[in-house]
């Protein structure tokens, strides 16, 4: 099971790393992905859809915190897509039912993997998505931190 490295405030996801890129594409908004996909396709490169974007159920697995064992939390709806852009394959899986974002994300993934001329702009946008995602995570953590229970303090009061 792969650990979620982005949970650390210091970790900066690398859009050139495919695993990180998958996470960033999944977090990116549909309009941004579609815009980049359209720009990549402007030159009419050979494109074949290897997996049509269709919503599916996926078992979401988390790690149980006490014994650190995998735990099936439940099924979630995701939309995967896979393309071949020239000789390069691209894949994306986005949360929910969103065929356009999944197909666009797969095209974006292939473009970055192939070092398309739009790669610098795509990478910059994905890095900005990662920065926003980390900031949101820090805000959420700060808001929920005051609900932490200190069991040692509770035991001392009894």
What are the residue ranges of the model-derived segments?
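Residue-level preference for alpha-helix termini and adjacent loops
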Residues: 24, 48, 56-58, 70-77, ...
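Structural signal for hydrophobic packing residues in well-ordered secondary-structure cores
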Residues: 28-45, 111, 115, 119, ...
